[in-house]
Design a protein with these regions (language model features):
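N- and C-terminal low-complexity/disordered segments
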Residues: 2-4, 17-118
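Hydrophobic helical h-region of N-terminal Sec-dependent signal peptides
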Residues: 5-10
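N-terminal signal peptide c-region/cleavage motif recognized by signal peptidases
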Residues: 13-15
Length: 118
């Protein structure tokens, strides 16, 4: 039993291997207007912004695993209501888990599809 406990503690002490990531030039997002059912893919350069309905979406950074650029992208987004000026979302969105960190808006959904690598 002591051997198992020591092995478990050793396993916890060894840090997980970090996955190498790269920054992309922008992000591909999908936006949905829940009232009209209209979806639009938004191509946003890093540091740039785009309007969708009453929202203004800004992409600060988009990162992806070097070994697998088509999956597990994550982007830092700021989403503001253009009418009120209120920030609706500010943080990292993860393409593989859109519900993990999502925009909470009664009319619009915005989620990350992938980083723009070309």
């Amino acid at each position: 039993m002591k051997g198992f406990a020591c092995l478990a503690l050793l396993a916890l002490a060894v840090p997980a291997a970090a996955q190498e990531v790269a920054s992309a030039g922008g992000a591909i997002l999908r936006a949905l207007d829940k009232n009209t059912g209209i979806t639009e893919d938004l191509d946003v350069l890093a540091g740039g912004s785009v309007d969708f309905g009453r929202l203004n979406v800004t992409v600060s950074d988009c990162r992806y695993p070097v070994d697998d650029p088509t999956s597990n992208a994550f982007a830092h987004l700021d989403i503001a209501d253009r009418r009120s000026g209120k920030t609706e979302f500010s943080g990292w969105m993860v393409a593989a888990s859109p519900a993990l960190s999502a925009l909470d808006d009664p009319r619009y959904d915005v989620w990350l599809l992938r980083c723009k690598t070309s």
